[in-house]
Amino acid sequence: MKVAVIGAAGGIGQALALLLKNRLPAGSDLALYDIAPVTPGVAADLSHIPTPVSIKGYAGEDPTPALEGADVVLISAGVARKPGMDRADLFNVNAGIVKSLAEKIAVVCPTACVGIITNPVNTTVPIAAEVLKKAGVYDKRKLFGVTTLDVIRSETFVAELKDKDPGDVRVPVIGGHSGVTILPLLSQVEGVEFTAEEVEALTKRIQNAGTEVVEAKAGGGSATLSMGQAACRFGLALVRALQGEEGVVECAYVEGDSEHASYFAQPVKLGKDGVEEVLSYGALSDYEKSALDGMLETLNGDINIGVEFAK
């Protein structure tokens, strides 16, 4: 099993690489790529950790050696958010980066499962899909927007509020991966009750959690460590499913058969070919129905920007 981390010298990439070096199954290969010359050094540093995972790092303009033979590609390349920026401000730089990486993937490892972390995810995933479609290698079961950070934040905040073990809390999060498009389904959390005020406050906190971190870091970056953890959780779930484990379910932003938008985050069952089944997100509360209706114009607008950019 080969996993490639693209953008591996950045804050998310280094955190993700550290976690994967520790947690990938024995015998796995971990490849790190970044344009930054430090990348082989990041791999050398991580190679001293005593786990049965081999690691190599590649720098420069060409990600080909990292992508060759990859089963899973996790893309965190791009610029990070600064105070005052929203995820859409990242588009101008990151859209081009994702487009060129997707063009490489189409040639070098067209059958790999690709998880996109680079923001704005609502838009970068459609860009990658359009590139892969043009190349004739698109498989919608194998392209994911990684929205797991919204899930782990939801689990953490609910556990804090209700004095639960976060490991026992499950919160499906649907929609997209920015602002109002993030919709945690708090009505489906088992074993807890929320007041209307709690639902509203929690939903807003989850939607704005990225900004909370950007502001707390005071210009020094965005959510890198928690995002690394979220991407690791998603990447490991993919690896387990590809290796034949049954019943692996995570939320992800995929091209499915959603009636709401051509790309939509919801629970997906993972299997040996990527998405085995897009699962129903179940019954919504009135608050959630209203929030879903209210986000769709934004979400569909984000998707269209990506499709147009890739033309």
Swiss-Prot record:
Keyword Oxidoreductase appears in the UniProt entry: yes
Molecular function GO labels: L-malate dehydrogenase (NAD+) activity
Residues annotated as binding substrate: R81, R87, N119, R153
CDD domains associated with the record: MDH_glyoxysomal_mitochondrial
Catalytic function, reaction form: (S)-malate + NAD(+) = oxaloacetate + NADH + H(+)
Record key words, sorted: NAD, Oxidoreductase, Tricarboxylic acid cycle
Binding site for NAD(+): G7, A8, A9, G10, G11, I12, G13, D34, N94, I117, T118, N119, M227
Assembly mode: Homodimer.
Family note: Belongs to the LDH/MDH superfamily. MDH type 1 family.
PANTHER family reported for this sequence: MALATE AND LACTATE DEHYDROGENASE (PTHR11540), MALATE DEHYDROGENASE, MITOCHONDRIAL (PTHR11540:SF16)
NCBIfam families, per the entry: MDH_euk_gproteo
Name of this chain's protein: Malate dehydrogenase
